[in-house]
């Protein structure tokens, strides 16, 4: 009889995805309930603020003015990517911890933004990084941060694998 690890692969890492999803949704609810649209609360003067913004597009508001169809396009993409990530996680070996964490972070972030997109028609953003109140990076959220960290980890794993034939955690 196969053990749980061989049957389910690294699906235990879905707990990390769930944690990302919960932190993302709780933080979005907090800022949506405590800020007015585009209001800024300065955390670190000239560098970092909390805000409230809705994004109907993708990263950097890509296709935000699409008229509504983009909501469903990005939702379908998120569902497909999430399914691929779950299958990938399931197939990982016992020693693929670095890769499992990366995939779980991306999955949790994708699900957090997918929920917003389907339930609300937009993604809630609340983190604002800027330089001297003049040069602003687009607002983002916890899910976006998890996706970014996971993607960087995936890239590092690929570069390490390509260079040495081993994964980062080998």
Swiss-Prot record:
Transmembrane regions listed in the UniProt entry: 11-31, 41-61, 69-89, 95-115, 136-156
Pathway(s) served: Protein modification; lipoprotein biosynthesis (signal peptide cleavage)
Cellular compartment(s): Cell inner membrane
The reaction(s) this protein catalyses: Release of signal peptides from bacterial membrane prolipoproteins. Hydrolyzes -Xaa-Yaa-Zaa-|-(S,diacylglyceryl)Cys-, in which Xaa is hydrophobic (preferably Leu), and Yaa (Ala or Ser) and Zaa (Gly or Ala) have small, neutral side chains
GO MF annotation list: aspartic-type endopeptidase activity
Membrane topology: Multi-pass membrane protein
Leader sequence segment: none
Keywords of the record: Aspartyl protease, Cell inner membrane, Cell membrane, Hydrolase, Membrane, Protease, Transmembrane, Transmembrane helix
Family annotation (InterPro entries): Peptidase_A8
Enzyme class: hydrolase
Keyword Transmembrane helix: yes
Active site (catalytic residues): 125, 144
Gene Ontology cellular component list: plasma membrane
UniProt similarity note: Belongs to the peptidase A8 family.
Functional note: This protein specifically catalyzes the removal of signal peptides from prolipoproteins.
Protein name, entry field: Lipoprotein signal peptidase
Source organism per UniProt: Pseudomonas fluorescens
């Amino acid at each position: 009889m196969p053990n749980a690890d061989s049957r389910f692969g690294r699906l235990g890492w879905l707990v990390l995805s769930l944690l990302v999803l919960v932190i993302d949704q709780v933080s979005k609810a907090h800022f949506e309930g405590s800020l007015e649209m585009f209001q800024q609360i300065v955390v670190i003067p000239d560098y970092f603020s909390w805000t409230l913004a809705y994004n109907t597009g993708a990263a950097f508001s890509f296709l935000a003015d699409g008229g509504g169809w983009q909501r469903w396009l990005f939702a379908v993409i998120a569902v497909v990517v999430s399914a691929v990530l779950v299958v990938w996680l399931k197939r990982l070996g016992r020693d693929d911890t670095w890769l499992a964490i990366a995939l779980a972070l991306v999955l949790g972030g994708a699900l957090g933004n997918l929920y917003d997109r389907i339930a609300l028609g937009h993604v809630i953003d609340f983190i604002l990084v800027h330089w001297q109140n003049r040069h602003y990076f687009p607002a983002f959220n916890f899910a976006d941060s998890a996706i970014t960290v996971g993607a960087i980890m995936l890239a590092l794993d690929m570069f390490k694998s390509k260079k040495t034939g081993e994964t980062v955690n080998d």
